[in-house]
């Protein structure tokens, strides 16, 4: 009696570098038994994540037709983003009101939120759906975030969903020099992640440092006047 054996992977497995992109190839063998054994083989190639610097990213957009997808939260996106990009955040504001979330949000807002201006977020459950609604699986996507971590995580999810032409900017937008991309917003792309008390502290430190340097120079060059202004304590 004829029988069908479902496809299973063989021992053939290799990786290769092609055009700066790592490739995996897996050979699948399907066996159809009907008197004589007939073997069919097909090759499935999956492109892995490609990391590029800012200049290479600019070339991907201009020369290879990559679309920019900004996966940052709304706050950083509004401060500065690449012109004509799509905004599909990997994380969204967490406004849940269960007791556990309220406690976590309060702790976050009094530490990370206060000092670094980081919003309290959760994974966007509509991320994949939003990408699918805007881009087909054969689209070329350049994912960007502020540090490079969220874009890498987003790329991993998209690869699992069948997207193969994906690139990310190494170290994110914080590594982009002013003028590299045409941007929209109140600040430069590399500064969009800076917020909270740490930005004020930086300005205070600069002013305080200037005052101390001036005081030191005054004491060195005008010791008599300095002694009158700051008499030594007995």
Swiss-Prot record:
Swiss-Prot/TrEMBL keywords: Chloroplast, Membrane, Plastid, Transit peptide, Transmembrane, Transmembrane helix
Domain Rhodanese: from-to ranges: 62-185
CDD domains given in the database record: RHOD
UniProt membrane topology term: Single-pass membrane protein
SMART domains: RHOD (SM00450)
InterPro entries tied to this protein: Rhodanese-like_dom, Rhodanese-like_dom_sf, STR9
Active site: 145
Membrane-spanning residues: 204-222
Stretch forming the transit peptide: 1-47
A cellular component term, taken from the record's GO annotations: chloroplast thylakoid
Pfam family, one: Rhodanese
Predominant location: plastid
Domain of life: Eukaryota
Record's subcellular location: Plastid, Chloroplast; Membrane
PANTHER family, A to Z: RHODANESE-LIKE DOMAIN-CONTAINING PROTEIN 9, CHLOROPLASTIC
Protein known as: Rhodanese-like domain-containing protein 9, chloroplastic
Organism of derivation: Arabidopsis thaliana
The organism's taxonomic lineage, starting at the top: Eukaryota, Viridiplantae, Streptophyta, Embryophyta, Tracheophyta
């Amino acid at each position: 009696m004829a029988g069908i054996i479902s496809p299973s992977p063989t021992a053939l497995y290799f990786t290769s570098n092609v055009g700066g992109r790592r490739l995996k190839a897996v050979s699948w063998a399907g066996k159809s038994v009907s008197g004589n054994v007939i073997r069919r083989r097909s090759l499935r190639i999956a492109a892995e994540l490609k990391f590029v610097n800012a200049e290479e990213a600019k070339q991907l957009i201009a020369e290879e037709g990559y679309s920019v997808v900004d996966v940052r939260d709304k706050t950083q996106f509004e401060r500065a983003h690449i012109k004509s990009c799509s905004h599909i955040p990997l994380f969204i504001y967490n406004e849940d009101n269960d007791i556990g979330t309220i406690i976590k949000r309060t702790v976050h807002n009094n530490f990370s939120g206060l000092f670094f201006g980081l919003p309290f977020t959760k994974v966007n459950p509509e991320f994949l759906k939003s990408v699918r609604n805007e881009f087909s699986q054969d689209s070329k996507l350049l994912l960007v975030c502020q540090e490079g971590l969220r874009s890498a995580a987003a790329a991993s999810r998209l690869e699992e969903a069948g997207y193969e032409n994906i690139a990310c900017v190494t170290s994110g937008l914080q590594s982009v020099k002013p003028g590299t991309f045409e941007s929209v917003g109140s600040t430069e792309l590399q500064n969009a992640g800076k917020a909270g008390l740490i930005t004020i502290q930086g300005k205070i430190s600069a002013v305080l440092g200037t005052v101390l340097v001036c005081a030191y120079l005054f004491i060195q060059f005008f010791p008599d006047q300095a002694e009158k202004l700051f008499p030594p304590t007995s």
